[in-house]
């Protein structure tokens, strides 16, 4: 009987140590993994913040450029008109907007245009497109699905 008690004590010690060893390993893995997951989440969140900041700046530049182009066109229109109307193709703001313009619809013609004059109809179309792009980006950033109006 003394031998059985000794054997049970030894087995208890081995099982206890094994359990603590497995628990220690599990704890060590968790400590190593969880900060990595948190760091990855922080990186994704920071990338999202950076993306939203770049998008905000792009929209700001597009609107500012459109306003300047509209003013230049109005000045040309009110002047002697002995030169060609101002063309925004090649302007930084327009070239930044161009790849975001749709391939179909009224604004599609500006995507591949060689000359874009910011008269009132053009101004309206480009302004609406900038607003559409901004709204799409805001919906994407919020994670919501857009409501279709019809």
From Swiss-Prot:
Q: A Gene Ontology CC term for this entry? A: cytosol
What are the boundaries of the signal sequence? Answer: 1-21
Q: Does the keyword Signal apply?
A: yes
Query: Does the keyword Signal belong to this entry?
Result: yes
Please provide the record's keywords in A-Z order.
Signal
Please state what the protein is called.
Uncharacterized protein Rv2297
Q: What is the lineage of its organism?
A: Bacteria, Bacillati, Actinomycetota, Actinomycetes, Mycobacteriales
